Regions:
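Amphipathic alpha-helical packing segments from all-alpha helical-bundle domains
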Residues: 25-32, 102
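Acidic/histidine-rich alpha-helical segments that form the ligand environment
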Residues: 86-121, 132-141
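Positively charged, low-complexity intrinsically disordered regions
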Residues: 27, 79-81, 89, 108
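Terminal targeting/low-complexity segments that flank the catalytic cores of oxidoreductases
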Residues: 1-10
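Active-site rim elements
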Residues: 12-19, 89-93
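Short, contiguous alpha-helical
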Residues: 4-5, 15, 19-23, 30, ...
């Protein structure tokens, strides 16, 4: 067996690393948000600002739109404004299940991309290549994970 057949290619490693990082961030968000009461999950401790629940809706919508809908052709139709203004939020089990499903969609879509597809332009030109867009989406998730951590401290008054 040649060395190349027993080692991951750079493309495989990049795809794996992106998905693993996103899954770790998702797990961190769940760890922060799951212990909260519904009131804490949906309260807005900073005005103007977002609730933790609304940020989770936003992360879910972002992944479903840019990765699921645009790259995976899932047919997802985004309502970004609703992500931040939902007045009748979903039950917590549904909120977390939808986040899990969005991250699973990313894994499925990314696993199916070839090197040529990763290097191709993303449907939204502002992102550059598909690979660069995927890096952006992971960074975006990380940014909001940090905000969620801060909001948990505020709602828990820690």
């Amino acid at each position: 067996m040649s060395a190349s057949s027993t080692q991951k290619t750079l493309t495989q490693e990049a795809k794996s690393a992106l998905c693993e990082e996103l899954e770790q961030l998702r797990d961190a968000v769940r760890q922060l948000a799951e212990p909260l009461t519904d009131r804490e999950l949906w309260s807005k401790p900073v005005d103007p600002g977002n609730s933790i629940g609304h940020l989770i809706l936003h992360l879910t919508g972002n992944l479903n739109h840019f990765v699921g809908g645009q790259l995976g052709k899932t047919g997802y139709v985004r309502d970004r404004e609703r992500e931040f203004a939902e007045s009748r939020p979903p039950a917590r089990a549904e909120l977390f299940a939808n986040l899990d499903a969005a991250v699973a969609t990313v894994r499925r879509v990314v696993d199916g991309l070839s090197e040529a597809q990763l290097l191709a332009p993303h449907p939204e030109a502002k992102f550059g290549s598909v690979y660069k867009a995927l890096m952006h989406f992971v960074a975006h998730f990380a940014l909001h994970r940090g905000q969620i951590s801060y909001l948990v401290r505020l709602v828990k008054k820690v």
